[in-house]
Swiss-Prot record:
Belongs to the PsaM family. It comes from the Eukaryota. It comes from Euglena mutabilis. Coiled coil: none annotated. This is Photosystem I reaction center subunit XII. The gene is psaM. SUPFAM superfamilies: Subunit XII of photosystem I reaction centre, PsaM.
Amino acid sequence: MGITSTQIYIALLTALIPAFFALKLGRELNK
């Protein structure tokens, strides 16, 4: 079963969104 570009895009979003929020939260806490 091949991996489509859509699946890659969804996987990237799934990985990046929590990381983005963690980074944003970390910056808020470091103030």
